[in-house]
Amino acid sequence: NHFGRTPPCTESLLWAGVSRVVIGSMDPNPTVRGGGVDALIQGGVDVDVGLLEGECEEQMSHFMHWCKNRRPLVTMKASTDSEGRVDGPPSQPSSRFSSDRSLELSHEIRAESMAILVGIGTVLRDDPSLTVRGPDIGPRGTPIRVVVDPSNRIPGECKLMMDTEAPTLLIQSSEYDSSHDPPHVERVVIAEEEIPVSRILDM
């Protein structure tokens, strides 16, 4: 029962003469929570709340987290060896500890995310694409690729700068020349030498 970009759906339900409404989970947004139910009951509609509530809240977990914390839900993905290392020695080529199944799961996580964030070290070491790949992923959107690069070390010929499949956002400590950046690349300045993740999440 909230006026936002669209009018309240409660008015449409009452106007249509709907006699019964089943709600799996209450709206997690505290500014509107409960108002729609009250309006429907006052309009003579039979309202049931809580059917498959756990399943509904799981589907809305990202949105519910944002409503509560006003920050995006963060999922960390890491592959390590038996000693807890995520890569081999810097003097050797980049190592991959992931199995085929873990790679599939990684792309499933990417497909459910709005952005993928890495540090400049990952870009320099691996030259990743940070796109969603896999035959079973389905037609989902490609997340924004975010690189924390305070000192503008990103190579102009790396995949994130050359590949236009998804937008690339560079988080930097100062303004740098962006006149040669392709259209899919955007730069944002957070004026701190060591950029805290909290500042990025608050953007």
Question: Model segments located where?
Answer:
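Short, flexible helix/strand-to-coil boundary loops that buttress conserved ligand/catalytic motifs
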Residues: 25, 60, 90
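Zn2+-dependent cytidine deaminase-like catalytic core
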Residues: 1-56, 193-195
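Short, surface-exposed, charged/polar-biased interaction segments
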Residues: 34, 39-42, 61, 68, ...
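Generic structural signal for helix capping and beta-alpha/helix-loop junctions
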Residues: 30-31, 57, 155, 178
